[in-house]
Curated annotation (Swiss-Prot):
Residues 862-886 are annotated as: Disordered. Residues 550-597 are annotated as: GPS. Residues 628-634, 691-709, 777-794, 853-886 are cytoplasmic. GO terms for cellular component: external side of plasma membrane; plasma membrane. Residues 31-79, 80-131, 132-171, 172-220, 221-267, 268-316 form the EGF-like domain. The keyword Repeat applies. This is Adhesion G protein-coupled receptor E1. Residues 1-20 form the signal peptide. The keyword Glycoprotein applies. Glycans are attached at N94, N99, N127, N167, N189, N194, N232, N258, N312, N366, N375, N448. It comes from Homo sapiens.
């Protein structure tokens, strides 16, 4: 068969070749085998003999031009059939068809292959069909770290997850460069083609896996506080960690505030051992496990404005006193409180003391229990019932016992203000004791309001301004108490009138009122601007010859005594006595009977002497200003001294008792302070000048303007007193003015702002005068003959001694008015001090010859001689003028 085909193919080729080159036109042979004539059929056709005929048929792959399969027409041609344009394509899918003459050739497209191979033509063995080539079977088709994906007729390479295509290669992708690759609190770990997320220490994955990718899982904080911290501590969980903190009241054993070491312990802090005390002064600290508590000692209570919780706990003194506060510095009372057996002589005394303290302790020891004024008052009644037994005690024991009792009653009353009971009793009336109290609410809302409190016929009148001045910080209240029978034991033997030390032995004293007491909350108890008025009922009618004395009970190292300081008599009648006091205290009235001539005598001497001094000072000032013959620096010093003394004594007479206006009284006291100090400083100036004069006797013109200027002397004489007054007023402005006189306060020690400089000047003057007398003794013998013959040496010596009194001896006498010679000292002080102006006029005017001559000319009307020797007058004028330069 194969050979036949080849033969046929060859024959066709030969015929084609022949036909193409030899194509003679001849008439077909109709007889026999017609197909012998090759020209009968066109090229690419076959001739087929039939009976008596033939027909032509185009070969395979060709088609007749007339569309007939068999034809004889010589004009018909066989045209090549384009099989590749047929549909479907003869080569099949995924192939390419190439038309050939009479046939076609099949080849597979790229990516496909046929078992017969490409360039297949019909007739070749096998069936041509194109199937896809799987390129991915070849390992080198795609680069490393990529995946090959086969497709129909092709393939593709894609980088694996975790890689990125770059320059026909697959490079690793660093997923950790993206902050969103892992969740919060995780660490990203990049690997080749992959990455992993690991939770940070202190966190764990929500998926439960150690490593993970992406945000499908989260890192959740591990709560380490379940069992990581020791006892008495607090565990604080933080993101990824934790720390331990000891509870308040505990401290870590390693000293670190926050710790994680499990070996650390939280140990209790003993806050009560700290210095200074955690609770503050006057407190009691009690330590507890992890805490402590604060309390206050007796006599103190917690400050309501602070708290232990806030760390500002403090104890402030209660409104009332407790046992520790009222015990005076007395050996007998101390023995009663030592807890040991007392001497038989003190048994009764200690029993009375302990009875009083038992009532007071009930109030002080229980700081929260309310205090009933009625109950505590009745508790003191048994003490007053036994007051007659106090007469067997010594004076010191009686005064100590009275001090304890009076202060205990005051403390109990103040306690009732601080811890009042539900049923407040404003007044308690008993046979031996009356108390009327008043809590201040709206009573003092208006100005100039006064309150009256009455007890046993006695009365206390107090203004709201005084209550406000008491500086009460909590409950404000006042009370008035009157005791029955206490005047019999606290009698006149406990009184010493320090304001009238000159009373004679003929004066008799007696108690003539009940002992009363004013009680008020607040720390300030005395020195009030507005006085407190006490009206005390006389036990016996006052006689005309009797002088009442208001006395207050003052405690001292020996227990206590009556004193007249701080109170004055406003009015006295037969039935009552009105006292004006600048203090809240226990009071009574003592009647003094007998001759009081010495007090009156001093009053007359003082006022008459001051009036005489004022007249003399006016004359001296006029003399220094008008007498030209003696006008020099020395007379200027005398002039300033006289002016200051004149103003001081005038203001003293006119304003010492102007106490109605508080501010005006303080101003008067301030001016008196300044003027009297100025007198002393000008006296000091004169002492210095006198010293210089005697020391420089040989140099007559020793006081020239170029040595000492008057301006400097004035600055000293007026400036230093002003400095003392300004400093004193700045330190204690309330020291100026008292309730009974406009002078410096003698009860607070403020008087030393005057006495201090005075004593200093006196000491300096004494030293200068002593030195002056010594120099005078040495120099008088060397004075030139001309001066010594003037017989003025005795006058100079007299002036030196007289200057001693002018420069302060009288004030020395005033300071030493104590002891048995107090009366004599008082007389000397009053006489010399009141006549100080007269002494100045006598020494510097009447004993000066030039002045006497001027007086004579003024009186007689004669004119001054034209020529007069001044040489003999040098020492008489005490100091030459600067213009007298010889």
């Amino acid at each position: 068969m194969r050979g036949f085909n080849l033969l046929l193919f060859w024959g066709c080729c030969v015929m084609h070749s022949w036909e193409g080159h030899i194509r003679p036109t001849r008439k077909p042979n109709t007889k026999g085998n017609n197909c012998r004539d090759s020209t009968l059929c066109p090229a690419y056709a076959t001739c087929t003999n039939t009976v008596d005929s033939y027909y032509c048929a185009c070969k395979q792959g060709f088609l007749s031009s007339n569309g007939q399969n068999h034809f004889k027409d010589p004009g018909v041609r066989c045209k090549d059939i384009d099989e590749c344009s047929q549909s479907p394509q003869p080569c099949g899918p995924n192939s390419s068809c190439k038309n050939l003459s009479g046939r076609y050739k099949c080849s597979c497209l790229d990516g496909f292959s046929s078992p017969t191979g490409n360039d297949w033509v019909p007739g070749k063995p096998g069936n041509f069909s194109c199937t896809d080539i799987n390129e991915c079977l070849t390992s080198s088709v795609c680069p490393e770290h990529s995946d090959c994906v086969n497709s129909m007729g092709s393939y593709s390479c894609s980088c694996q997850v975790g890689f990125i295509s770059r320059n026909s290669t697959c490079e690793d992708v660093d997923e950790c460069a993206d902050p969103r690759a892992c969740p919060e609190h995780a660490t990203c770990n990049n690997t080749v083609g992959n990455y992993s997320c690991f939770c940070n220490p202190g966190f764990e994955s929500s998926s439960g896996h150690l490593s993970f990718q992406g945000l499908k899982a989260s890192c959740e904080d591990i709560d380490e506080c379940t069992e990581m911290c020791p006892i008495n501590s607090t565990c604080t969980n933080t993101p990824g960690s934790y720390f331990c903190t000891c509870h308040p009241g505990f401290a870590p054993s390693n000293g670190q505030l926050n710790f994680t070491d499990q070996g650390v312990e939280c140990r209790d802090i003993d806050e009560c051992r700290q210095d200074p005390s955690t609770c503050g002064p006057n407190s009691i600290c009690t330590n507890a496990l992890g805490s402590y508590s604060c309390g206050c000692i007796a006599g103190f209570h917690p400050n309501p404005e602070g708290s232990q919780k806030d760390g500002n706990f403090s104890c402030q003194r209660v409104l009332f006193k407790c046992k520790e506060d009222v015990i005076p510095d007395n050996k007998q009372i101390q023995q009663c409180q030592e807890g040991t057996a007392v001497k038989p002589a003190y048994v009764s005394f200690c029993a009375q003391i302990n009875n009083i303290f038992s009532v007071l302790d009930k109030v002080c020891e229980n700081k929260t229990t309310v205090v009933s004024l009625k109950n505590t008052t009745e508790s003191f009644v048994p003490v007053l019932k036994q007051i007659s037994t106090w007469t067997k005690f010594t004076k010191e024991e009686t005064s100590s016992l009275a001090t304890v009792f009076l202060e205990s009653v005051e403390s109990m009353t103040l306690a009732s203000f601080w811890k009042p009971s539900a049923n407040i009793t404003p007044a308690v009336r008993t046979e031996y004791l009356d108390i009327e109290s008043k809590v201040i609410n709206k009573e003092c809302s208006e100005e100039n309001v006064t309150l009256d409190l009455v007890a046993k016929g006695d009365k206390m009148k107090i203004g709201c301004s005084t209550i406000e001045e008491s500086e009460s910080t909590e409950t404000t209240g006042v009370a008035f108490v009157s005791f029955v029978g206490m005047e019999s034991v606290l009698n006149e033997r406990f009184f010493k009138d320090h304001q009238a030390p000159l009373t004679t032995s003929e004066i008799k004293l007696k108690m003539n009122s009940r002992v009363v007491g004013g009680i008020m909350t607040g720390e300030k108890k005395d020195g009030f601007s507005d006085p407190i008025i006490y009206t005390l009922e006389n036990i016996q009618p006052k006689q005309k010859f009797e002088r009442p004395i208001c006395v207050s009970w003052s405690t001292d190292v020996k227990g206590g005594r009556w004193t007249s300081f701080g109170c004055v008599i406003l009015e006295a009648s037969e039935t009552y006595t009105i006292c004006s006091c600048n203090q809240m205290a226990n009071l009574a009235v003592i009647m003094a009977s007998g001759e009081l001539t010495m007090d009156f005598s001093l009053y007359i001497i003082s006022h008459v002497g001051i009036i005489i001094s004022l007249v003399c000072l006016v004359l001296a000032i006029a003399t220094f200003l008008l007498c030209r013959s003696i006008r020099n620096h020395n007379t200027y010093l005398h002039l300033h001294l006289c002016v200051c003394l004149l103003l001081a004594k005038t203001l003293f007479l006119a304003g010492i008792h102007k106490t109605d206006n508080k501010m005006g009284c303080a101003i008067i006291a301030g001016f008196l302070h300044y003027l009297f100090l100025a007198c002393f400083f000008w006296m000091l100036v004169e002492a210095v000048i006198l010293f210089l004069m005697v020391r420089n006797l040989k140099v007559v013109n020793y006081f020239s303007s170029r040595n000492i200027k008057m301006l400097h002397i004035c600055a000293f004489g007026y400036g230093l007193p002003m400095l003392v007054v300004v400093i004193s007023a700045s330190v204690q402005p309330q020291g100026y003015g008292m309730h009974n006189r406009c002078w410096l306060n003698t009860e607070t020690g403020f008087i030393w702002s005057f006495l201090g400089p005075v004593c200093t000047v006196i000491v300096i003057n004494s030293l200068l005068l002593t030195w002056t007398l010594w120099i005078l003794r040495q120099r008088l013998s060397s004075v030139n003959a001309e001066v010594s013959t003037l017989k003025d040496t005795r006058l100079l010596t007299f002036k030196a001694f007289a200057q001693l009194f002018i420069l302060g001896c009288s004030w020395v006498l005033g300071i030493f008015q104590i002891g048995p010679v107090a009366g004599v000292m008082a007389y000397l002080f009053t006489i010399i001090n009141s006549l100080q102006g007269a002494f100045i006029f006598l020494i510097h005017c009447l004993l000066n010859g030039q002045v006497r001559e001027e007086y004579k000319r003024w009186i007689t009307g004669k004119t001054k001689p034209s020529s007069q020797s001044q040489t003999s007058r040098i020492l008489l004028s005490s100091m030459p003028s600067a213009s007298k330069t010889g």
